[in-house]
Swiss-Prot record:
Protein name, as recorded: Melibiose permease
Claim: tRNA processing is one of the keywords in the record: no
Domain text: Apoprotein is apparently conformationally labile and readily converts to different states, including inward-facing conformations for substrate access. Contains a conserved cation-binding pocket, which directly connects to the sugar specificity pocket.
CDD domains assigned to the protein according to its UniProt record, in alphabetical order: MFS_MelB_like
Gene3D superfamilies, sorted: MFS general substrate transporter like domains
Catalytic activity, reaction form: melibiose(in) + Na(+)(in) = melibiose(out) + Na(+)(out); melibiose(in) + Li(+)(in) = melibiose(out) + Li(+)(out); melibiose(in) + H(+)(in) = melibiose(out) + H(+)(out)
Result when mutating T121C: Alters cation selectivity. Inhibits H(+)- and Na(+)-coupled activity, with little effect on Li(+)-coupled melibiose transport
Single GO term (MF): symporter activity
The gene coding this protein: melB
SUPFAM superfamilies noted in UniProt: MFS general substrate transporter
Phylogenetic lineage: Bacteria, Pseudomonadati, Pseudomonadota, Gammaproteobacteria, Enterobacterales
Functional summary from the UniProt entry: Mediates the transport of melibiose and other galactosides by a symport mechanism. Can use sodium, lithium and protons as coupling cations, with a preference for sodium and lithium. The use of Na(+) as coupling ion for sugar transport is based not on ion selectivity but on competitive binding under physiological conditions, because of a much higher Na(+) concentration under physiological conditions.
Record-listed an alpha-D-galactoside binding positions: K18, D19, D124, W128, R149
Similarity comment: family membership: Belongs to the sodium:galactoside symporter (TC 2.A.2) family.
Length: 476
């Protein structure tokens, strides 16, 4: 049975509210902390680094907790609701730091930021873990996933466009109050969209059903071992890490490249101007693309398009050409590639969940998506590390004309490093990734037959609302 439009739109609306709420943190929290609250850049940078390290530990543990959950509402929906409500509260507190001073302010900022990351993880992991439970059909997933990816991207563009005007209009000179009030708008959308998702999106092929209900719960140590035994998940994580490092290097370093190498920072907005539209358009036409082209071709496109973007920027720098149209084209190529990557990645993680059940007879949706989330955050951290390392090695000095050697080093950061990582994703995919064509069809047929033989699992009415099975292995 095909997925209804109501399900697709409800899942997409949930992604909109979720990313509407997170967008203000990714885009404006640094500005809020430094320019509104008055914290030092060093303190904020250290806090962000510590939070990413904690995420690397926290995300898989949260995935394990979700995987061990059994409830009358399924294994994911309770955590989506809990995560939404707690993250909404913490989001409001996050932008209330301007109300404190001195040591109390620093402590408040550190505690609320760490709590924000933890509560968002509670919601985000089970939200994306719904994908492999909605359908086992390859084509249906390819029709489903563009909806949440499109709405998530749209939320980011809306956040970028309306945040500062809202803050100025409502807060006036008191920007802290403006930010605080804007979080209430975000929270309203966040909670409303989550309710729509919970009402209309259903777990059909979850590991919390009659097929797996009688199996013993897995310890955290066993779960970590299963990640390595699922060779296709390991391969996908390697590809995702390489891709995220490359794209984060470009996103984080582009302003430096335009300022010093191309020599005109005013051209940077052209690089971004049509990129968002290209991203959204790619997500809209993805269902048609995947009918016309194989996933192998689309993955190649996801990796090659950003390489062409880098090559275009490199050629303009060498020829000393300042052409807005070429810069717009470079931004479009980059965003077409990244849009393809993000939608393919979500689908492919779902495929590795099916593969794990096919090969190991164990279905762990939340574990797969938790380690995928960890890899995305790791990619951001590694990218920042590479940028800082190379800038130090090449003798970069801010706000002055750079030497020829430094400019060459900047080209290495912006062009060579990303291209190497993008090429790595291609090599890993075509050499080691096998979940395509006949292999995927074989897995789908096997699992459909398996789930048809066992009716959906239903909790008894008198069972506990949420039961998380703990084990002595949690420290593993």
């Amino acid at each position: 049975m095909s997925i209804s439009l109501t399900t697709k739109l409800s899942y997409g609306f949930g992604a909109f509210g979720k990313d509407f709420a997170i967008g203000i943190v990714y885009m404006y929290l640094m500005y809020y902390y430094t320019d509104v609250v008055g914290l030092s850049v060093g303190l904020v940078g250290t806090l962000f680094l510590v939070a990413r390290i904690w995420d690397a530990i926290n995300d898989p543990i949260m995935g394990w907790i979700v995987n061990a959950t059994r409830s009358r509402w399924g294994k994911f929906k309770p955590w989506i609701l809990i995560g939404t409500l707690t993250n909404s509260l913490v989001l409001f507190l996050l932008f209330s730091a301007h109300l404190f001073e001195g040591t109390a302010q620093v402590v408040f900022v550190c505690v609320t930021y760490i709590l924000w990351g933890m509560t968002y993880t509670i919601m985000d992991i089970p939200f994306w873990s719904l994908v492999p439970t909605i359908t086992l059909d390859k084509r249906e997933r390819e029709q489903l996933v563009p909806f949440p990816r499109f709405f998530a991207s749209l939320a980011g563009f809306v956040t970028a466009g309306i945040t500062l005007p809202f803050v100025s209009y409502v807060g006036g000179a008191d920007r802290g109050f403006g930010f605080q009030m804007f979080t209430l708008v975000l929270i309203a959308f966040f909670i409303a969209s989550t309710i729509v998702t919970l009402r209309n999106v259903h777990e059909v092929y979850s590991s919390d059903n009659g097929v797996t209900a009688g199996r013993p719960h897995l310890t955290l140590k066993t779960i970590v071992g299963l990640i390595y035994k699922n060779d296709q998940l390991s391969c996908l994580l390697g590809m995702a890490l390489a891709y995220n490092i490359a794209s984060n290097i470009i996103n984080g370093f582009a302003i430096y490249y335009f300022t010093y190498v191309i020599g005109d920072a005013d051209l940077f907005p052209y690089y971004l101007s049509y990129a968002g539209a290209a991203n959204l358009l790619t997500l809209i036409v993805f269902p048609r693309l995947v009918k016309m082209l194989s996933r192998r071709i689309l993955w190649a496109g996801a990796s090659v398009m950003p390489v062409l973007s880098c090559a275009g920027l490199f050629a303009m720098a060498l020829a000393d050409i300042h052409n807005a149209a070429l810069i717009v084209a470079a931004g479009i190529f980059l965003n077409i590639g990244t849009a393809l990557f993000w939608v393919l990645q979500v689908i492919m993680v779902a495929d590795t969940v099916d593969y794990g059940e096919f090969k190991l007879n164990i279905r762990c949706e939340s574990i797969a998506y938790s380690v995928q989330t960890m890899v995305v955050k790791g990619g951001s951290a590694f990218a920042a590390f590479f940028i800082a390392l190379v800038l130090g090695l090449i003798g970069y000095t801010p706000n002055v004309a750079q030497s020829a050697q430094t400019l060459q080093g900047m080209q290495f950061i912006m062009i060579v490093l990303p291209v190497l990582f993008f090429m790595m994703t291609l090599v890993l995919y075509f050499r080691y990734y096998r979940l395509n064509g006949d292999m995927l069809r074989k897995i789908q047929i096997h699992l459909l037959d398996k789930y048809r033989k066992t009716p959906p699992f239903v909790e008894q009415p008198d069972s506990p609302a949420i039961s998380v099975v703990a084990t002595s292995d949690v420290k593993a």
